[in-house]
């Protein structure tokens, strides 16, 4: 037994004194001194600490933090010897959950208690459960950017700080609903206001404030954001986060699973807000026409949110809508089950044949050319695109045959100018071949664009998603078409008028510099006619879908240096591929699909990522702007997200995620 003494007062056993500070990491905190042995288990040490403090309170959330090893002692049955703790260990007895300031995707600030002892993946899952956000695996936390000291100190406007630090949820139990919201939000007027902030879109920002916010001016600037992601396999305490620190909550992985407006009001709204701010802060590029569509959708969403019309548009019966949807689904199933249709789909391979105008840019042009598009007869079958001089020559050898698997497909569209082009960056031994296809109209463009997108993923037009892809492209084009509403088309929602419309709060600053407000307002109102009948949830979904249609959507940028190269380049990470980008001009140099990846490894000693693809293709690079852990986690995270199944619901294989994203980096 620890602490046995002789008559003279000397200790005759192997016990020794262990000092433990009470509270968070503060050298001046009160401390207790315990008499322990190497065989003392952590649970017994915790009990002795509480007995010596002799203060009645709930200690259930407290645990011991070992400062030198940056480790929580959570295995209460382990002994001090098993942990390797000696008398010189600096130990702190403090709470595992501590307050942090969370900056949400909608830019609002929220105080809550987060776990400082669990891996970040679990801590984010608990935060999302508190905020009523499904599929927490899509989100993560970033460090807040360091504030630059200004020569002239400006008085920052006071912002409202919502507080959920006193809300505690029972573990493992899904929050019950009360009055249309999770029950823990209905406890007080403050928590109810917090839920409304989470689930309802925020008004447009002040245009002057928007112009002052930092924006990326180059690809290298865009890499800075992704250097701040926290490690999902380590706890907040291990990563130097302290109580009261500010963190950002963002959607990290651009692979959104089972997005349902009925069950996901908070998730849908926060995703819309992240997309909106991506556009306003120019973190993703879009054309002038596309910006007008996004501005019109924001204007419509803001009007509906302010008027309280959050449900279906007036004049509709939800019951009838549900019945119509059910009948429509039944009709589709009955039509799709016809034996002749099934037979045709099995015996015929879908293909596209049409006249298209083609312009091919050589990899290294010897001289400048003024030659433009030339009309060809183009045949698109499976994942192969072939073009001929004329239709009569089609049975023979083509001028060129391209396998689009693994290529980059970029839209180049101007609806008002009737320009419908598809830019293809096709991998070749010399690099990426650049080819443009020019279509005659929207219908032709939608069919060929959908086929190219599927082929780039290794799928054919026989895939069940081809028709929905065509429809999604046509829907996005229809939003950009002006004047389609007509004078007699009166929206069911709030009246569309210039009253209360400040266009500078709806468009990115580069468009503010290019156009005057009186030029933007009629264009936004004209685009609004195409979306005026959408409900709030439909408008948010349409905004997100349009955001997903942009060429640069879902690409996270990291500055790297490839093995054997003397210059820095950009590595783009998307949900299905890696993209090598020239830092100087922004051109895509090479693309590698995750589906062709055999394995990847990280050498933590030399900070290098090595990836092996099919056909004995090996790629290695070191990271410049961020830790190689971030690239490793992105790759593993996207592979994990691709394993999700609808049948499993929200059940997560946490061990698999940590296996795919965790590293063996020495802390």
Swiss-Prot record:
One of its GO terms (molecular function) is integrin binding. CDD domains: FERM_B-lobe, FERM_C_fermitin, FERM_F0_KIND3, FERM_F1_KIND3, PH_fermitin. Residues 229-558 form the FERM domain. Keywords: Cell adhesion, Cell junction, Cell projection, Disease variant, Phosphoprotein. The keyword tRNA processing does not apply. Interacts with ITGB1, ITGB2 and ITGB3 (via cytoplasmic tails). The FERM domain is not correctly detected by PROSITE or Pfam techniques because it contains the insertion of a PH domain. This is Fermitin family homolog 3. The gene is FERMT3.
